[in-house]
Amino acid sequence: MIFSKISQVAHYVPQQLVTNNDLASIMDTSHEWIFSRTGIAERHISRDEMTSDLAIQVADQLLTQSGLKADAIDFIIVATISPDATMPSTAAKVQAAIAATSAFAFDMTAACSGFVFALAMADKLIASGAYQNGMVIGAETLSKLVNWQDRATAVLFGDGAGGVLLEASKDKHVLAETLHTDGARCQSLISGETSLSSPYSIGKKAIATIQMDGRAIFDFAIRDVSKSILTLMAQSDITKDDIDYCLLHQANRRILDKIARKIDVPREKFLENMMRYGNTSAASIPILLSEAVQKGQIRLDGTQKILLSGFGGGLTWGSLIVRI
């Protein structure tokens, strides 16, 4: 049988740094108010780089680190809710920029679960035997979706990108998987609506910026995500003691605190970086993974079991247990 493994990781964030104090100068908020509720102290905001620019930086790093030629890449998946345009896809721009002429490329839209969903799909593509090498990148410029007059949401989000290179392997590395969607609760977190605009249309005004029912999302993350992780471990016969690190979507420190207690995993196993990047949606998990590799916490030698878990708009949530 053929399996997939993560062989390389990379991340990139825009240079512009915006602190909580910077935000306090343009809206009614403070560092203390933001940090005490979210654990976020600063975030990176793009001045002129588009989502594809961030993703291209990551793709270039992955190629350089791997030593592969661009034409060895079979597919590129970019998870994003903030593409440059509806078409072409952000992934198509990445494919062109790195001259991966043999690769097919497409975007995945699953909000903050996007990287986990895309990684699960990429694993199946390689397991099919038809493809050997693929890139999975989460990239966002959420700053263009934020209502900068709404302090409840504007303080939460940042821009950035992270990704992995997947290669074929004779050994199984994706050990367990669970993916979920509940469209009945989709109105809890929305952005980027478009209006019907033909001469024959009568429609409501679209909501372009991020709108969130914070309490509903907070409760959803604690209840549904915790339950799915516990079910995943039980079904796969993997215990909490088997897990080396938990890399969850970086939405809010209090969410991580409560999930850690719910699944009874030591809090120190939960890596976090939301204090420096904010919520980067589909980019948050791969950025966290890349930083953990840089710090030597995760070794990429196939000896550690890592829980990856994303949750967000859709509503979507999903988890993978991966040997890295």
UniProtKB/Swiss-Prot annotation:
Keywords tagged on the record: Acyltransferase, Cytoplasm, Fatty acid biosynthesis, Fatty acid metabolism, Lipid biosynthesis, Lipid metabolism, Multifunctional enzyme, Transferase
Domain of life: Bacteria
InterPro entries: ACP_syn_III_C, ACP_syn_III_N, FabH, Thiolase-like
Disulfide bonds: none
Catalytic residues identified in the record: 112, 249, 279
Any Gene Ontology CC annotation: cytoplasm
Pathway assigned to this chain's UniProt record: Lipid metabolism; fatty acid biosynthesis
Stretch list, region ACP-binding: 250-254
Function: Catalyzes the condensation reaction of fatty acid synthesis by the addition to an acyl acceptor of two carbons from malonyl-ACP. Catalyzes the first condensation reaction which initiates fatty acid synthesis and may therefore play a role in governing the total rate of fatty acid production. Possesses both acetoacetyl-ACP synthase and acetyl transacylase activities. Its substrate specificity determines the biosynthesis of branched-chain and/or straight-chain of fatty acids.
Family, as annotated: Belongs to the thiolase-like superfamily. FabH family.
HAMAP family, sorted: FabH (MF_01815)
Subunit structure and binding partners: Homodimer.
Protein name per the record: Beta-ketoacyl-[acyl-carrier-protein] synthase III
Gene that produces this protein: fabH
